[in-house]
């Protein structure tokens, strides 16, 4: 099992012959159900599914269910971050772990693009989403020279699985690839917890009080993009 971002892995094995017995599996951050399992909770998700299937409201349990969902959005599904939260129950310390992960990703982005364009595009995801524009506006992040020959950089970013691309399509039916416009896209961080940390990247660390306010839904910051 090879761990790390796919950028590092591909760089490290690019000259190694891959045996035919190798089976490649894609690993993703924990989803909400897996996160609840890590929290020792195997009952909530089946219960939510029952209510959804029956199309009935949660009632008094809704507030706790939303708080648990916000906790997942803040911690995210990266195993190191989840372990830190389980060990410390401290969102600020968990944030420090997520910052280390993001720093590794930024280092990897600089490996594939030494001009720093990939890293800059990644760092600008929160601000671009906050503009509520129809697509990622590369022109507001990179100058004219930086926007030249960008398709290869974007392809490497997509292959890294650190970011997710959502492409515009005029006819989003079967055969989506026939109608998608790869010049018209939005870019998202692949993990909600990393997105929250990246949104507060201007601070040396995200204070525990900020996390607590986000968790209790009392901070004015728009959580819509985390959803």
Cite the ranges covered by each PLM segment.
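Conserved Walker B catalytic segment
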Residues: 1
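Interdomain motor-coupling "hinge/lid" segment immediately C-terminal to the ATP-binding subdomain
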Residues: 4-5, 10-130
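Accessory nucleic acid-recognition modules appended to NTPase machines
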Residues: 82-227
């Amino acid at each position: 099992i090879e761990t790390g971002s796919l950028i590092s892995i591909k760089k490290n094995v690019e000259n190694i012959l891959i045996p035919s017995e190798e089976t490649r599996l894609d690993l993703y951050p924990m989803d909400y159900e897996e996160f609840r399992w890590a929290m020792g909770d195997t009952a909530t998700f089946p219960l939510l599914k029952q209510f959804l299937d029956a199309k009935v409201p949660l009632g008094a349990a809704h507030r706790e269910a939303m708080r648990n969902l916000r906790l997942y959005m803040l911690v995210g599904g990266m195993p190191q971050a989840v372990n830190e939260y389980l060990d410390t129950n401290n969102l600020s310390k968990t944030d420090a772990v997520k910052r280390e992960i993001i720093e590794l990703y930024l280092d990897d982005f600089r490996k594939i693009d030494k001009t720093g364009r990939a890293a800059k595009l990644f760092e600008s995801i929160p601000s671009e989403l906050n503009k509520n524009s129809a697509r990622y506006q590369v022109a507001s992040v990179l100058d004219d020279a930086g926007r030249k020959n960008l398709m290869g950089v974007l392809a490497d970013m997509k292959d890294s699985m650190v970011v997710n691309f959502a492409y515009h399509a005029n006819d989003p039916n079967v055969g989506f690839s026939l109608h998608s416009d790869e010049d018209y896209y939005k870019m998202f961080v692949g993990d909600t917890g990393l997105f929250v940390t990246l949104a507060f990247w201007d601070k040396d660390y995200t204070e525990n009080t900020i996390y607590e306010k986000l968790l209790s839904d009392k901070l004015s910051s728009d959580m819509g993009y985390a959803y």
